[in-house]
Amino acid sequence: MNVDVVARLRSTFRTGRTRCLEWRRDQLNALEAMLLNHREHWQIALGQDLGKSPFEATMTEIYPVITELKHTRRNLKKWHKDQPVRTPLQFFPGRSWVRYDPLGVVVIISPWNYPLQLQLSPLIGALAAGNCVIIKPSEISSAVEQLFAELAPHYFDPEAVAVVTGPADAATALIDARPDHVFFTGSTRTGTAVAERAARQLVPVTLELGGKSPTYVHHDVDLKATARRITWGKFINAGQTCVAPDHIYAHQDVAAALAEEIANAVRESFGARPEKSEDFGRMIHTGAVDRVGAMIPPVGSDNVICGGQVDREDRYVAPTVLYPVAESDPAMSEEIFGPVLPILPVSGPQDAAQRMLTRDTPLALYIFATDTSVRNYIMAEVPSGGVSIGIPVAHVGSPHLPFGGKGASGQGKYHGKWSRDTFTHQRAVLSKPLKPETMGVIYPPIHGAVKSVLDRALSPVGDKKRRAPGS
């Protein structure tokens, strides 16, 4: 069946109808209508899957998509028109340009943690580029999956946009059907499997993965403001965010005070009993509760500054701050992807950078420092997919910035015009008229004068004699 859907959409693509800017704009308008007309239904579904409040569902899932959509729609014509470039002198008279051609049939495999935003944001780019698209929502966030599958045929062109539901095997079958591109968001382990599967078919992939995104806090910052911002970025969606601050390296002079300030910020945000707060979500399933709960020392342990409670039946893990933490502790063994925040004291930015470099390249890097030289040092020393200074997560929400990983945290970029680049083939075109004929000098037989001109063109500037390195 999945082979059939790829073939069916490819037939649609070959008619050329998706290349029309009007069609692309119509699909973007349809996406906007589907979101806004059913805003309450999306809020309910997100509440069922992840315990999100209506406000959090709107702020983290609906609003970012609408922002991205409006930005893309506003720039649609400009981004996708031919781009003239310079033509080398030897090809004059002539013209050169870059065409942004749609790829064809694109498969988007989306995750469960932001099940609406992370399937619709890439969909915006794929549709704007003129592709036919197959969306495979995560079966784990089943309420959103079912709602999307129900609504999509009533809004999108059904011959160009398809939704495939079901277990992970359905995604595997889609890859085997040889689409023109696969866009995957999820774990590094699954992303590796997707890349390997796609490589067998020579299908290009974009991988948006994750990792342990670190934070460095220097001794010169406002600790209260820093703590409040980190608390927001860490505990939104119960910590199940691919760019959440995974752990903190705090300067030893302020580490203990920072831990207390974050604990205070947790209480200010979610009250004395976060399980009663509508602003604090739930883990996706009991397996996630068990995995994250195993990272937490027993309640009452000296390094549990706040939280530590777990209710498996309610899928609840309390917002938890751990200090001090060692590199060998359970919370540092893998990406946490939950509401547990370890804080490790360090002697300074050099110590923090060296520790960060012992791990895979993260999707995000966060720096809290007033001293510009400290910020620049960390950014220069530590590679990452993206960086936010003075606030976590925020860079992901800008359609004017590329979003993507590096190394183990992913490959490829999207958002804004970077989605255009991901979902199009940048096609080189050079056009030269047959008259006047200016190419005769390079046609065989080659005359000595032409060879002399070429030799002079390749002569080193300012030194007519070539010298071997070191001579």
Language model: regions and residue ranges:
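N-terminal Rossmann-like NAD(P)+-binding subdomain of aldehyde/semialdehyde dehydrogenases
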Residues: 1-97, 470
